[in-house]
Amino acid sequence: MSSKTLAKFLEENLEDLKSKGLYNVIDPLESSNGPIITIGGKEYINLSSNNYLGLATDSRLQEAAIGAIHKYGVGAGAVRTINGTLDLHIKLEETIAKFKHTEAAIAYQSGFNCNMAAISAVMDKNDAILSDELNHASIIDGSRLSKAKIIVYKHSDMEDLRQKAIAAKESGLYNKLMVITDGVFSMDGDVAKLPEIVEIAEELDLMTYVDDAHGSGVLGKGAGTVKHFGLSDKVDFQIGTLSKAIGVIGGYVAGKQNLIDWLKVRSRPFLFSTALTPADAAACMRSIEILMESTELHDRLWENGRYLKQGLKELGFNIGESETPITPCIIGDEVLTQEFSKRLNEEGVYAKSIVFPTVAKGTGRVRNMPTAAHTKEMLDEAILKYEKVGKEMGII
């Protein structure tokens, strides 16, 4: 007999979410996650994928994955520290380090795992973490797991960061201090003020930790936000995902050799999870090689991002202050935002609404993710649909 307490909890809370319009219905794709997707037999222009460079369906990555399966099989067969480390994993990590301009790197099974692994391997209850208020959920969870004191500073407010860092240091309560920030903030597309953060960190001896999930492949000619600012030798932890611009799955931490050596013996996701599959490792490595060989996809992504931004702005939409191809269309009211997204969907544009509590109340938006794989014709069609629905609903 199943638990009555659990049944009551689930029924009440699921009903509460549904009554508030916050229950997320998942739409399964019947196609690859490219610029055009198929859901329920209908085709849509896809503006919701983080497959920034279109590499998730690139034939070169497919060939690399298939070749690895033929040589190594479909699974690594063990955790990395027993005998699940393939020469492929070592080559991938060497490639990541070269890509990120660091001494070494370590690969994990997901980007989320990286933040669960790296923060708690270095920080503990005797330490403090200064964290931007808009940092990703995985940073928040990784920080909590470490049991360190979490000190939240106002979003990209360098004076607030400085004052809180000084107070933490002068308190004498903490052995180590770390400042953590996203490189690119995914909801608005703005970029962290890394030069100022590094300056404060050097002044007060803070460890620096940058999660560049949305910056790798996008900024710094593809190498990421840290490289964009020329700070590769100034940031202690460079965190990245292999599932967005890279187009596959997994994550990594890049930094000094002794940091990576420590993570290999102390980060729990590395120690207690089976290694990346051979296919994923091979595809990730090929993807990074492509980015290091040419900026063609990177340049096309930015061209498409500018094109979509200009089109929506000229129509009168509020697209915020994004500094990257991420293009939020800020509607405001939660219900209106969800209805706007629904109408776009009906018109053949798949652009999901993002509302409270993911973003602040009254700042509901439809987040658009143009990619290198979109054609101008696709973007023109999407802009036309935005105009039609926006005027119909009195938004523009």
Swiss-Prot record:
* UniProt-listed Enzyme Commission number(s): 2.3.1.-
User: What name has this protein been given in UniProt?
Assistant: Putative pyridoxal phosphate-dependent acyltransferase
Q: Which Pfam families match?
A: Aminotran_1_2
What family does this chain come from, according to its entry?
Belongs to the class-II pyridoxal-phosphate-dependent aminotransferase family.
- Keyword set, alphabetical order: Pyridoxal phosphate, Transferase
Against InterPro entries, the record matches this protein to:
Aminotrans_II_pyridoxalP_BS, Aminotransferase_I/II_large, AON_synthase_class-II, AONS_Archaea/Firmicutes, PyrdxlP-dep_Trfase, PyrdxlP-dep_Trfase_major, PyrdxlP-dep_Trfase_small
Taxonomic lineage is:
Bacteria, Bacillati, Bacillota, Bacilli, Bacillales
Q: Which coenzyme or cofactor does it need?
A: pyridoxal 5'-phosphate
Q: For pyridoxal 5'-phosphate, which residues are the binding ones?
A: G111, F112, S186, D211, D212, A213, H214, T241, L242, S243, K244
What organism does the record attribute this protein to?
Bacillus cereus (strain ATCC 14579 / DSM 31 / CCUG 7414 / JCM 2152 / NBRC 15305 / NCIMB 9373 / NCTC 2599 / NRRL B-3711)
Gene Ontology BP term (one): biosynthetic process
> Which cysteine pairs are joined by S-S bonds?
none
Complexes and interactors? Homodimer.
Which of this chain's residues are annotated to bind substrate? H136, T358
Q: Which domain of life is it from?
A: Bacteria
Q: Report a single Gene Ontology molecular function.
A: transferase activity
Q: Would the keyword Transferase turn up in this protein's UniProt record? A: yes
Tell me where in this chain the PTM N6-(pyridoxal phosphate)lysine is found.
K244
Keyword Isomerase found: no
